[in-house]
A protein has these predicted regions:
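Ser/Thr/Asn(+Pro)-rich, low-complexity disordered segments
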Residues: 1-153
Length: 153
């Protein structure tokens, strides 16, 4: 599962670098496609190499991938926070979506969705210390379930 998640994250990263649709701003320091609010159409899915991909980046995708792609994700985090700052970062963290191809002032969806904010917090902590994964894996119910499924240490 870890390797599959890493591969999926790297697909997003490489897609943004290749940028086949020529969207402004996408690249090594701006990638991450998933369901989120969108400055053009409201809440929708953004998937690489589909009609739904319109240049909108969902910060949660790259930020939440930090355990799988630490260098690539940290590049996005630094770019969003230090270079774009208040354009993409608000009181509760990164806004839900950003599309650099749009007119300034219309590029950012200034919403905070729990389904997008929550994974960022948890995965940053897992990257930092492994805390949440470690607590989860020590729960007796989880150990029992894994044992019943044939998993061994």
């Amino acid at each position: 599962l870890y390797e599959r998640n890493k591969a999926h994250s790297l697909i997003h990263y490489k897609y943004a670098i290749e940028n086949p649709k020529g969207h402004e701003g996408l690249g090594a320091d701006l990638w991450g496609f998933t369901s989120s609010d969108d400055p053009l159409v409201g809440y929708t899915s953004h998937h690489p190499n589909t009609d739904a991909e319109n240049g909108t980046v969902s910060p949660t995708a790259a930020v939440s991938s930090i355990v799988y792609t630490p260098e690539e994700s940290l590049g996005v985090i630094r770019h969003l926070y230090y270079d774009l700052g208040p354009k993409v970062f608000g009181k509760y963290g990164f806004y839900d979506a950003y599309n650099p191809s749009m007119v300034d002032g219309q590029q950012t969806v200034r919403t905070f969705l729990a389904i997008d904010q929550g994974p960022q917090v948890g995965m940053i902590e897992n990257y930092r210390s492994g805390l949440l994964w470690n607590i989860f894996m020590t729960a007796p119910e989880i150990q029992d379930g894994l044992s019943k499924l044939g998993f061994t240490k």
